[in-house]
Amino acid sequence: MAKKNINHLKHGKHSKFARFFVDKRSTRSVGGNIVLIIFLTLLALMFLFPIVFMFNNAFKPLHELLKFPPDTFVRNPTLDNFLDLSDMFSNSLVPLSRYIFNTFFIVIIGTAGQIVIASMAAYPLAKYEFYGNEFISKLIVMSLMFSTAVTAVPNYVIISKLSLIDTYWAIILPAFSSTLGLYLMKNFMSQVPSSIIESANIDGANEFTTLWRVVMPIVKPAWITFFILSFQSMWGVTGGNFIYSENLKTLSYTLGQIAKAGFWNVTGVDIARQGVVAAVSLIMFVFPVTIYIIIQNNVIETMTMSGMKE
């Protein structure tokens, strides 16, 4: 059957590109496959090298960190960098547990809010025709071209007028308006067959129930992918422009300040804190990557999902 389809593509009335693709695929040699595998392996190693280097740096003693040229792998692993970081927090007026609570509170509420709001906004845009639908969809695409730096000043003005400066909501509320999440959810919800929604309505389900009990399970790969993107974004938010009280600051902000202090002080480069900087980098990197590894299958499913047809 497959051979018949290939012959049909070769001799049928199809584009030159399709015939060229089939010819190349059917005549590709074993040597070509080996070259492709070698190329992809080298590409993977190139992306993996910075991660391996960062992991090893976190456990290097100071004399290995300052060695030039640097060694990729640690020779005398130590936990001194993490112990130094712990000592810095123990001498702080605010305990480490408070920074961790602030971070997870902001990340969890912000991420959940983005998914809920983006899904509820995307559903009518994807499944219902109304005046202005196309205009709103184009506006969403256009808004993706704007950097967050462009909206920094308007966000500050709005947050200030709402008297939310120096509160958790100064960071959480701006995150709720995620155009990327709205765009992603709309595209996937538009692939859900309308017959499924009509069947749910016939069975007596209202729009709210249809969205959360029928549509959301179908587009699970999409909102899990959005969850990862949102989590990574919220995890890296410092909130330094909106929060001034030390007991409300996030772990990301505090670790970032420690890293900056490790690079520079009044006299120049602060050599003594380079190990702490390496430990900070690893801590900020590990948790988002762990979340991604746990649910990576859903992300891959999102990338390979070809759509559904009635």
List PLM regions with ranges:
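A hydrophobic, multi-pass inner-membrane permease signature
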Residues: A2-E310
